[in-house]
């Protein structure tokens, strides 16, 4: 793997919780093109800020990149109790006040991070100058008839202590990462293991009449309470109201082979209706990429992001359901 751009870690208290914030570049970094402020990268569910390393390494400009670990992920403080989606918007609001109090921000959000960014940009349109959503396209409309069962499942989950699977050693953790994403390069998997695993010392277990301390095992550095079912249903019509309120130019990036795009097969009208909510939209499709596009195609994704951020403005919209790239 080529030499990685160095990052620095900071810890900032956001709404009472200690958050880890990873930065690349300097606060005074400037680009030649106008309207290129600091760049905020927002990771998805079960991911971390370090996951953007490959994307940052592919940028050609000297950005001041700011990426937090969302609450309960990575090195940010864990609640050890259920998480609520609106809290991410509150955390982002304070994060921008801290790092970019006097100018609107450029936001890049992947998956859950993209959904947070798109809602936030509708609530605080004056705080966002440009928005890039990497398959943060909203979720499936909740079936109201399943609401009682959904809440019942959540109540049952509250009676147990959640946990993630752990792994015997580094190699086993790496193999799981490679299994989850066949496009992941071995050196990428090693980097992710080093940044997203934590040692869990097993409790003493009785073995053949004596207590024997087992070796430490590796687990995900995330709060298992993130696994709990969200008892609050998702209302697509409400999300669309947020999206329609966005004033910033938006780049909508899809990955050709992702489970997100596969889920929209046969639902092209729904897909188009979501896109139609954005008043200033450009789209792009990444070929030979799954959902983790910042791992699968970091160079191509970096080129898309920088091309969009540094452009003087464009109203063109391409069809991401086609096989052509923007």
Annotate the PLM regions.
Residues 168-261:
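Alpha/beta-hydrolase
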Residues 245-289:
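Conserved loop-alpha-helix segment in the C-terminal half of the alpha/beta-hydrolase fold
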Residues 286-298:
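Catalytic histidine-centered segment of alpha/beta-hydrolase-like enzymes
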Residues 103-147:
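Conserved hydrolase catalytic core segment
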Residues 89-104:
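Conserved acidic catalytic loop of the alpha/beta-hydrolase fold
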Residues 1-39, 60-63, 99-103, 138, ...:
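Alpha/beta-hydrolase fold catalytic core
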Residues 23-78:
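Conserved HGGG/HGGXW glycine-rich cap/lid loop of the alpha/beta-hydrolase fold
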Residues 295-307:
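Post-His helix in hydrolase/transferase enzymes
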